[in-house]
Amino acid sequence: MKPVLAEILKLRGSTSWAVAVLLPVASVVSACIFVRPDGWRLLWIRSVGFYGMALLPVGLAVLASLVWRVEHRGSNWNVLMSTPVPTWRTVVAKTAAIWLLASGMQLVLVLAVAAVGVGALGLPGAPPGLCLAAGALTAVACAPACALQSAISAFTRSFALPVAAGLCLTGVGTTMLLAHVPGIWLLPHALVTRTTQIGALERGSATGFTVQDLTWGSAAATVGTAAILTGIVIAATTLALNRTDARN
């Protein structure tokens, strides 16, 4: 826990906090610009649409670059790699820091939906349990993408290159989902996109790809897939860092 806390403390004054707040808030606000949602379900659907297909996965890439940027300054990399701390702990700590920020984005999204729904739209009652459940499940699904983006950011000084890679992976994932390519959800970025839409629609035709119902089975499958993919990426990153200086 201490390594993760240390990584979070490194982000004091970082723009990562602004990214984690502004992207989900902008998504919810934009959901109300052209068409006024007349219910909680429609507000949620419109909020997670473009957010899940582009903003969130690319946002994870930006957060990963910000988390690793401090290590690529001056001689910080040499100091990091020469410490007695096992490489896997560093990789896990970085991934966890990125994932915590991603989870914060999901919390902000849910809170923004509640605030806009009650304060601006005057919707009756409170947001349905779907919002909380889907938000929590999406946070879990972000873990593999956080690990992959962390790995990409670890191997380059460039801030923009990992973001560009994240944009490309997001585009590939969304395109392949729209093309109904079997198993594409095993791509971390596609898993994020698919999970953001879970339970939001009764039929997948509204998004162009199949949308799962939110059930215990679909939730368990998402959690299991996320855990396995995250473990694989972290193990591969650790092995690669142990074998190379990883500097460009």
Language-model regions, residue ranges each:
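Aromatic- and glycine-rich beta-strand/loop motifs that create alpha-glucan
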Residues: 1-21, 245-247
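Residue-level recognition of transmembrane alpha-helices
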Residues: 20-24, 94-95, 166-167
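Terminal transmembrane helical anchor/hairpin motif
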Residues: 38, 163-248
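Secretory targeting signals
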Residues: 25-60, 64-65, 92, 96-159, ...
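Hydrophobic alpha-helical transmembrane segments
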Residues: 1-5, 43-51, 76-88, 110-113, ...
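Helix-loop-helix units of permease transmembrane domains in multi-pass membrane transporters
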Residues: 65-99
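Helix-capping/transition residues at the boundaries of transmembrane alpha-helices
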Residues: 10, 69, 80-82, 149, ...
